């Protein structure tokens, strides 16, 4: 039997070898087609195939035997791979469940689970109550003795250990240590006083009254708005057409700015805007022309929809809301107007946000040409943040021309009058006054980058520039890109850090010091509870591109990123988000760090004005949810940290590589605890930890870049 079996095997191998040598392409294609229909042909079918293809009966028989064997081996291999993947997922889920059981919290109070922990926490609260009562009695006795009046009884005071006062912050605005940056506590008093809840300001920050309650516009006000809109459209169009007579070159950086003499001669007579003294305010004007990868009609729609507008400019627009939608104007061309509130912020907590109430008008000039004009308008009972500069947007706008192949030519004009209530920080003063802060170049650079990103996002297959790695589906690719975009938006939002606490002992000539803020998060997409954020800005004598490449260099990342714990990092997936392959979103995999394994999602970009590198650690379970593409990425909780890189706009800066100086802002966030359980000790330890993280990261990065 063995010899017959061996003879049969050798015979089969010989025939298979002959098949490979002698079967023509036509014969193989016909056999493959028949195999897909009937993998087990009977004797008559084999003879029929042999006659048709001029093959022997044994050749047909052994070909089908070999083909069935190949198919069985392939299926078994695919099943084994699928089982391994499923087994890995189950192991990761088990590890995540074990980790969750180790850190389980009590649902009613958010505290540690277990009777002993509850008793310990209760004892701490009782001890604290005794201390507070003693302090109250001392202060009450002192005031009664020296001031002639007393304080209400302790029983009349609100329960300091009841529901969290952080829950009262509106719209998730930061509730911060200390007061605003203009009235900082002195260093000595800060070091002497205990780091308790009394140092935390949880009062909701002032919002424009109009956004909380506003009335419908009267017909008289609407008519006035229509007239303002008509004048704004005419002025913006004139500024574009009068390029040679109305625009001059800046003596500082050579960019195009409006000639103030000609502008005053032509336009200010009929303006509804009030001019301020030149000693109190300054004008910022600029114009840029770019071509973007987006259809003109889609672009117009995104400009008129405030939600899409905020998404199109995630690193500039922090808030946007449509207040009034006005009826179409009585005009031969299609025209739409609306009143919009927007808050803008860029680069660093040292840069104050700007707020506007804008009348935005869109008018179709030709079949393939649209003009969108913005101009500030005055509404009653509007109050902005107390420290924000007074900003008036003089007629500005965008001319959008449709081009072939789904592209658009965009001419952007930005013209703003700014009255600063607080002198800008010296690190960013030249950049803001030079026009690179909120100028047209920043808007157009962001527009180009986002249009390219949206174009790549909508692709139905992996482009050759991508490295999918662990991401196997196009849905997973889109999920990762969407998560990276939301991470950039969230990180840009926290940069406002309104009402922050400066630590002056950390400050230096080229360093802003460390600023800390605390907020209670209740929004989806971020961990619910208390979050501490610390940030710092500094100047580096290096071009922005060099700093950007350093922060993305995986070979040295473990030397400054605490999430790596000193272990090397590898790239698990990479998706390019623009024509420059340096702009990408990546999944990074640190080497095994004890029992807790994680992945890091990172999104970064670089353009003519600077860039960002933003990242967030994820446990493997959350990372697999993002990679699978089966989960809505907006529901995946992320807490981003990262860096904002900006060119220094100082007149002495070189244009090579975006300038010879870089302004770098870094910010780290720490999740303290859930929404219903925290102590002063938690806040103190977390603030100290995040302050140490920022300070040590600054020192390490400066040392590695030889900038000490």
From Swiss-Prot:
Sequence segments annotated as region (Disordered): 1-24, 162-188
Function text: Probable transcription factor.
UniProt GO molecular function: DNA binding; DNA-binding transcription factor activity; lipid binding
Gene name as annotated: HDG10
Main location: nucleus
Subunit structure: Interacts with ANT, BBM and AIL1.
Localization per Swiss-Prot or TrEMBL: Nucleus
Keyword terms of this UniProt record: Coiled coil, DNA-binding, Homeobox, Nucleus, Transcription, Transcription regulation
Tissue distribution: Expressed in exclusively in anthers with highest levels in the tapetum and pollen grains.
Record InterPro entries: GLABRA2/ANL2/PDF2/ATML1-like, HD, Homeodomain-like_sf, START-like_dom_sf, START_lipid-bd_dom
Record-stated family: Belongs to the HD-ZIP homeobox family. Class IV subfamily.
Residue ranges of DNA binding: 16-75
Matches recorded under SMART domains: HOX, START
Coiled-coil ranges (or none): 119-141
Span of domain START: 218-456
Protein's recorded name: Homeobox-leucine zipper protein HDG10
GO cellular component term, pick one: nucleus
Stretches with biased composition (Polar residues): 165-188
Bridged cysteine pairs (disulfide): none
